[in-house]
Amino acid sequence: MKRTIAIVAGGDSSEHDVSMRSAEGILSFMDKEKYDCYVVEIKQGNWNAYDTDGTTYPVSRADFSFDTPDGRREFDFAYITIHGTPGENGILQGYFDLIHLPYSTSGVLVEAMTFDKYVLNNYLRGFGINVADSILLRRGEAYDEEAIAKRIGMPCFVKPAADGSSFGVSKVKEADQLAPALRVAFMEAEEAMVEGFMDGVEISQGIYKTADKSVVFPATEVVTSNEFFDYDAKYNGQVQEITPARLAPETAKKVAETTSRIYDILHANGIIRIDYIISKDQDGNDKINMLEINTTPGMTATSFIPQQVRAAGLDIKDVLSDIVENQF
């Protein structure tokens, strides 16, 4: 008997449309011989399931079921692909825990922590993971631009502490640019982070583990003519993505080991993607710096994870089946 899968997408953040595109990708990748799939869109308090023929069914938030002409349907599994709240910060995971529905991502604590970049950086620093120096600021809080510039250095990045897809992120080159950059960041979140600039090569690497396997995908190198890998670069093609990344073999091995270690430190679940900056230390050796973790990475046909799956010689259909079946 086929399992019924909810591909949960949308959400209440600026990333709603990006999430819906990922849902379309996952729907196309899923093994239809094993699973009956519905996209469930969450938007402004409305939860709706979409059949493959476009029919819409309101979803009950009491038990995550919906009525069809053939009777009530219940889901066996939720594949969460919301980028931002409530799917990437632990809220939706808590709901699914309450109704005892298995899902694709890490649990509440891991999702909440990885969504808050400042908290995540400080947590991983305690395990010896290299991260940028940063300062946390809250909306309405007084701050000294010159003191921040002296502490963090210039250039630096200003970003929402809890957000994704580079919404609200600015590269700041002078202290007097901090105030307008913070205003942009505070449009997306209550807290903003001023983070030191790390000069180097940006790469991104996906990973997943199940009860019987550990799969680290080939890393992708990100080359952009933009100031940084911003929203425009990510989603409007202003970037060159090279998979596998052009890394020295020893560096590639160390990055993969770091990716696996971070996954274990977090007790992560499902597919996650970790972004890094590969800089040079004072001796000219490659230094691996963790930049960000994506626990619901993009899943369109051109997103990093599908690219990396292909580069690894794997079938994305089988990878997604691994994620589902690991919960049963």
Predicted regions and their residues:
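ATP-dependent carboxylate activation and anion-phosphoryl transfer catalytic cores
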Residues: 3, 128, 249-328
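A glycine- and small-aliphatic-rich helix-loop capping segment at beta-alpha/alpha-beta transitions
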Residues: 94-103, 174, 179, 311-312
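Phosphate-binding site of ATP-dependent enzymes
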Residues: 173-257, 280-289
